[in-house]
Amino acid sequence: MQIDNLKNSKAIETLLPKYRANINDYVITLGGDKLLFTVELEGTSFTSVSDEELKTYFSSLDDFFLNLGKEYGGKLAIWTHIVKKRDELEQKYKFHSKFIQNFTDKYLSGFTNQNFFKTSYFITFVLKYNDLNDGLASCDSILAQANTLLNRYDGKLLSILDITDSVSICENNEFLSYLLNGTYQTITLNDSEVLDSVCNSDLFFNYDYFEIRNKESTISKYGTAYFLKSYPARTTLGMWDFLLELPYEFILSQSFIFTTAQKSIRAIEIQENKLSSSGDSATYQLEELEEARAYLSSGEIAFGDYQASILIFGETAKAAVDNGAKVISAFTDKGRGARWSRAAIESIYAFLSIMPDSKFRPLSSVRGSTSLVCGFSLHNYFSGKALGNPIGDGSAIMPLKTPTQGLYYLNTHYTPLKVNALGEFIAGHFLMLGATGTGKTTLEATIVAFLQRFNPQLFVMDYKRSTELYMRAYGATYFTFESGVDTGLNPFQLEEVASQDLLQFLYSWVISCSRDHNGLISDEDRMLIKEAVDAVMKLDIEERRFSMLLQVIPRSTPLYIRLRKWSHFEGGELAWIVDSPKNLFNPYDFDKIGFDTTTFLETQGHEGTEPLFSVLLYYKDLMKKSGRLLLSIVEEFYIPCSYPTTEQMIKRTLKTGRLTGEFLGLVSQSPADAIRSNIFEPIVEQTSTKIMLPNPDAEYKGSYERIGLSRKDFYLLKGLDKESRKFLVKQSGSSTLAHFDLSHCKEFLPIISGSTLGQQECEKIRSIYGDDPDIWIPLFLERMEEIKKEKAALKQNSQQNL
């Protein structure tokens, strides 16, 4: 193949349909008697949706085309396009923290020089009209009928968008331009004909390949073209879904020109005659045509002239030819018998056939509209939402890779793909479950790191100090509760003059310490508690503490007996939890704070769990500052959710947190226990995002089924190895597998994936150099690297001595 052999088709615009003008926001005029408009569809998450539901979607799409055929007959044509193109990570991430900037830069370096791909679906409607106004009304009617598709498949109408008061871009023109030029270009609304606006390349056609030389680029794009020669003998929904996994750019065009019933029957007869006289062993095709005639007569199917072409691209001529051969080979292996023919000297006509309303449609044949639906499944992999999200600047929290060479944009807030939800009060709570050793804390730390560019407040109730190192690195303060040591929590001293909100909390807080062995409390005891709290709050603020309640409650009452264990004055064994003489925490000053609650989480049924957690959650509510995001993470959340007071506090945050900008992360390494939580149903309902890490012991019935996972989701999750560094993300009805790999970020792992040794070394260094992350982090990482080398040397010496 020599470039010199290429033929220059400078006059290709003379062979293109006459795209005239943008007559309204979404319709383009064609020639003198046709109108054109396009919808873009992301598709449905077929790896998550049940097969039964996919069949329903298939039937609905089939009915949609059938009804259009009945209504418009030979006046309507449809061009569908499956477009797979390279995808790049374009978002830039800036942080104030040196550590986070360095860490995220290193993480994002894993996305450079990578081949990512994204698949999109398009349907272009070409309508012939007699009266322009009637034609436009028909376009409106077709669009109204297509609304179900737009909603189901995350679609949008390609239209004119106003960027400024004086500048508008034409999405529909840009799509035509992409088909012709092989690249997206911004096209603004102007007085030129649409055809003139979209023609921006010189095209050269060779026997084996074609070249697109864009006038605004010095880099050529190469492609090879194929016609569909033989359609599969037996079709089924999603029969070409294997294309979603192929790592090549392509445009698969399938056009369908509806015909009247009379013309369709005549066309079937002609095709029957051709098959009969050809001598080919095509008995099944003749049987299909006879069957089609019967369906056509009964109105159960719409017929038309069907044609398909595929353009496969590469960075060089050889790459294009090689990629084309691989794609066609995949059709041979998996395409249910579809036979493609390389266009060769007719490649220009294959190229032209992808343009909506092209008169060049080689190897077209009469087929039912169901055939079109089988090859245009609208199945796709869920890729998340890159822009237009509610928080920060609207960009996704962070990017992830998928096992199918795609990009996934992770968000905890879920909003429809095509809706710009920036600034809206949307629930962003998430549920994260995974067995021990699956990378849960590491993933959590990375998500929190990327969120720091939006400067959220942070509140964490931790287990085994798993978040301590990353919290301190992100500028948080962190406290550990030790058994027998005063917690420093004394809500009686929060306000000089107690607000009604504080009083109501104190009543419920003391009640949580006062229940009898059945977990109950009498109305009489409730009144005594209220009187005691009110009395304590009348004391000077420095005198207020839990023990002072017993100065008011009669000693002879059972309530007094039950409260003694919480009082230092009475030598109570649990006094260290609630009876601190001085409140050491001012929640109004909190910005980023974490508490290690291991002492309470490790002891099943610890009596201090409910009182302690309720104070912490109340302090969380008080720390929230207007206009700021607040991310609250509760590790092993099922434990606080098993107590009445804290259960209700968490439930309230789930329901109303969005109104104040709070989103809650409920995390557990014990999925079975978490799923048995008292309020698991509300948790599932209110958490818009479920992040499921591997769990080899997972069960579906009565367990992961309750999370809302489909059986397909569950089998994907169940098949993940604990060391796979993959996890499942579920949002709304869609899900995807994401790949999270920090193997190229090892120098940051001592903080992102902390250890007990790391916690100890961090304490030593901070005791000398202080808590400024910019100072202690470099010293800490250097020390951890030294320890790593020392261990390696010891291991080597021990092996040599064997």
Model region roles, listed by residue range:
Residues 1-384:
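Extended, folded cores of ATP/NTP-driven motor/assembly subunits in large transport
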Residues 44, 54-70, 242-244, 349-408, ...:
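P-loop NTPase motor domains
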Residues 402-403, 413, 417-427:
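Phosphate-binding P-loop
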Residues 432:
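Hydrophobic anchor at the beta1->P-loop junction of P-loop NTPases
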Residues 437:
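Walker A (P-loop) phosphate-binding loop of P-loop NTPases
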Residues 440:
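Conserved lysine of the Walker
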Residues 443:
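Hydrophobic positions on the alpha1 helix immediately C-terminal to the Walker A/P-loop
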Residues 679-692:
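A short helix-turn-beta junction within AAA+ P-loop NTPase domains corresponding to the substrate/partner-engaging
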